[in-house]
Structure formats: C-alpha cells, structure tokens
C-alpha cells in the first residue's frame, strides 16, 4: 500500500449525491470528518457528467467510519445520502495511485482555460485553497551507507583471483597458502631455507621394493 494506506478499510462509498457537486465540493464537505486523501466522482464516459456516486479515500479507517456514521441517510442539498465503507474489488492499489495532470492550462472540472479546478466557477461551495507544494529537499553529496556497501561488493568481485574458477581450484589455492605459512615458521636443522626450497616437494623412495616414488612434505 502506498504510504501505509488501507483503501479497503478507509474508503467511503457515497451515493445519491447532487450531480452538480464537484471534486472540490466533496473534498470540502468530507474534510470535516478527517484527512481526505483522494476524491473520485463516477462520471458518464460519454457526457462526463456526474452519476451522483463518489469514493472518498481517508487517511485512516477511523475517519472513514466516523464519516459513514455521520452522513448515512442524512440530507445533503435536498437529497438523502447513502454512505458505507466501500467493498474492495481488487483494484485498491490502482485507486490510491496518484495521478499527475501536466496540462495546467485547462480546468480539470469544466475543461475551460484561465483557471484551475480549485477556482472553478462550477464549484458550488466556492473556491478551495490549493494544497501547498512540497519543497524538494536537496540531496546530500555524501553517499548513503547502503550505496557504499554496494560499491565495496562490486570492487571485491572485480578483484577476485582469476585462478579461483572452480571449487576444487579454490580449495587447492587455500591449502597451498596454509602450507606456505606453516613452512615459514617450521624450525629447520640444516640452516635457513629459502622460500623456494620450502615450497618444493621432496621425493623419497618407497620403503618397500618398488620403482614408484612418493611425495613427502
């Protein structure tokens, strides 16, 4: 859910509304019951006129419940309003998705230019104060810790030894390193030995009669 909203529990279905009410009118009417997130009026797809039905999405379910109790079967502009918690039809996520209207030259309500829907002459309850624009926070140049971790992981992958192409090679490589460390610290009776001597395997004859040879450390 977007921002923690639960539209299946916080959306009010309102019917028998006056056809002349606009989105802004309904916003002002229902805002007294709580924070209104979105207002959707059902309109005829051909005439674009209201069907007298709307969905009011509140920020929390308590506000939605208070709204239904307050206005259900109550008169509004001469009509008896029906209100209830909307039944989720599986399109809740789509309903709460914010829509951006990039064409600011025309009013969303009436389609005429020169004003926006907040100041549309068709608003029965007058103009509504437009919401304040959110100030964009400047991003800090310092990378976030998560990004730093990702960069470290990438650099490690790039620096891998090409000899470690398989599991067996990796085991052999690690074993060779261990033996090299052991040979460095092993006391020698015949004087100091070079690193090349310590790493070179010694060959000795087998104890039993054979032409085979076996390796010793």
From Swiss-Prot:
It comes from the Eukaryota. Residues 120-217 are annotated as: Disordered. The keyword Zinc-finger applies. A zinc finger (CCHC-type) spans 105-122. SUPFAM superfamilies: Retrovirus zinc finger-like domains, RNA-binding domain, RBD. Residues 10-88 form the RRM domain. It is found in: Nucleus, Nucleoplasm. The keyword Phosphoprotein applies. The modification Phosphoserine is found at residues 155, 210, 216. InterPro entries: Nucleotide-bd_a/b_plait_sf (IPR012677), RBD_domain_sf (IPR035979), RRM_dom (IPR000504), RRM_dom_euk (IPR003954), ZCRB1 (IPR044598), ZCRB1_RRM (IPR034219), Znf_CCHC (IPR001878), Znf_CCHC_sf (IPR036875). One of its GO terms (biological process) is mRNA splicing, via spliceosome. PROSITE patterns: RRM, ZF_CCHC. Component of the U11/U12 snRNPs that are part of the U12-type spliceosome. Interacts with ZRSR1. Its main location: nucleus. Pfam families: RRM_1 (PF00076), zf-CCHC (PF00098). One of its GO terms (molecular function) is zinc ion binding. Residues 145-163 have a biased composition (Acidic residues). GO terms for cellular component: nucleoplasm; U12-type spliceosomal complex. This is Zinc finger CCHC-type and RNA-binding motif-containing protein 1. Keywords: Metal-binding, mRNA processing, mRNA splicing, Nucleus, Phosphoprotein, RNA-binding, Spliceosome, Zinc, Zinc-finger.
